Design a protein with these regions (language model features):
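Peripheral, non-AAA+ core regions of ATP-driven protein-machinery
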Residues: 2-136
Length: 136
């Protein structure tokens, strides 16, 4: 793992195996954060899980999709800070779909500060939901 915590990647692979039955023990996982950056915040978890599932199932995520959220040991997707700001930046940079923790989605829509017509917000409570909403 380059640019992120190796132990966190292993933990997320263990969550996929235990909670979703995805056989990760036989797989090698290579993770690289582009641009030489180092990202250690838990909001990266959901995107890492989606990337691992994408590779495992040999299916690409849809174009224009952004994912963020912390993943817990039982596969629950936890809220992260600065969610509204993250979505605002996603809109500015042209993303069309954002998969995020359900509690963050509800807060953003209730606040009404963002034009949610420009981006589809998909709230998830558990990593299992990625299979449907991300096409995996």
């Amino acid at each position: 793992a380059v640019g992120t915590d190796y132990n966190r990647v292993n933990l997320l692979m263990a969550v996929l195996e235990k909670r979703m039955g995805v056989r990760m023990a036989d797989c090698d996982a290579y993770v690289n954060v582009a641009g030489g950056m180092r990202v250690v915040e838990p909001a990266l978890d959901l995107a890492l899980v989606a990337a691992l599932l994408s590779s495992y199932h040999n299916r690409s995520l849809q174009d224009g999709m952004l994912l963020f959220g912390e993943v817990g040991l039982v596969g629950e997707v936890r809220a992260v800070s600065q969610a509204e700001r993250r979505v605002a930046e996603a809109i500015k940079t042209g993303y069309t779909v954002c998969v995020l923790p359900e509690s963050n989605r509800a807060s953003i829509e209730n606040a009404g500060n963002l034009d949610t017509q420009k981006i589809k917000l998909i709230g998830v409570r558990h990593v299992r939901e990625l299979l449907d909403c991300a096409g995996l």
